[in-house]
């Protein structure tokens, strides 16, 4: 059934709005998946905070025009599902990677981030990207390590002095 022009405009506006706040995007070929498998993918996407939509390629091209995901325009060929990571840059890639393990028919086509287009070989790299909280925790640990070592060194001076005095006292 053909979509009316108003419906097409609404879809383009919705996808464009989602893309404006997305951190990364992934597209995959979903041919060969059953309805239950697609429903499962949608459920997993909702749980992981990923916007997932099957959208016509022409409408997707209109939606990505003027966004950082414009690099995807030439890669939109065939029936594709579009996933946008909202909270963590690797969320969509992680979702697709985990789903692809159990479903051979599901094939990741491209990934995009910060205006750059990446092939499916980068899926593992994207999936390993830390969440914001994980990145901040790692940064905090890196910043805290020298201070912790310095405090331990300062604490060791009186401890060594006490041990020396105890050894001298034991020897007399």
UniProtKB/Swiss-Prot annotation:
The keyword Ribosomal protein applies. Keywords: Ribonucleoprotein, Ribosomal protein, RNA-binding, rRNA-binding. The keyword RNA-binding applies. One of its GO terms (biological process) is translation. GO terms for molecular function: large ribosomal subunit rRNA binding. One of its GO terms (cellular component) is ribosome. Pfam families: Ribosomal_L10. It comes from the Bacteria. SUPFAM superfamilies: Ribosomal protein L10-like. CDD domains: Ribosomal_L10 (cd05797). InterPro entries: Ribosomal_uL10, Ribosomal_uL10-like_sf, Ribosomal_uL10_bac, Ribosomal_uL10_bac_type. Signal peptide: none annotated. Forms part of the ribosomal stalk, playing a central role in the interaction of the ribosome with GTP-bound translation factors. Part of the ribosomal stalk of the 50S ribosomal subunit. The N-terminus interacts with L11 and the large rRNA to form the base of the stalk. The C-terminus forms an elongated spine to which L12 dimers bind in a sequential fashion forming a multimeric L10(L12)X complex. PANTHER family: 39S RIBOSOMAL PROTEIN L10, MITOCHONDRIAL (PTHR11560). Belongs to the universal ribosomal protein uL10 family. This is Large ribosomal subunit protein uL10. It comes from Francisella tularensis subsp. mediasiatica (strain FSC147).
């Amino acid at each position: 059934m053909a979509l009316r022009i108003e419906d097409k405009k609404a879809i383009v506006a919705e996808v464009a709005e989602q893309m404006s706040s997305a951190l990364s995007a992934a597209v995959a070929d979903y041919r060969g998946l059953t309805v239950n498998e697609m429903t499962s993918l949608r459920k997993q996407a909702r749980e992981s905070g990923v916007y997932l939509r099957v959208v016509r390629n022409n409408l997707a091209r209109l939606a990505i025009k003027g966004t950082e995901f414009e690099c995807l325009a030439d890669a939109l060929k065939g029936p594709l599902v579009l996933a946008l990571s909202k909270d963590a840059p690797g969320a969509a890639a992680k979702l697709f990677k985990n789903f692809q393990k159990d479903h051979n028919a599901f094939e990741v086509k491209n990934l995009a981030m910060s205006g750059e287009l990446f092939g499916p070989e980068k899926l593992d790299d994207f999936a390993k990207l830390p969440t914001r909280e994980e990145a901040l925790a790692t940064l905090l640990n890196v910043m805290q390590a020298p201070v912790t070592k310095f405090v331990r060194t300062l604490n060791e001076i009186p401890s060594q002095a006490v041990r020396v005095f105890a050894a001298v006292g034991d020897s007399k």
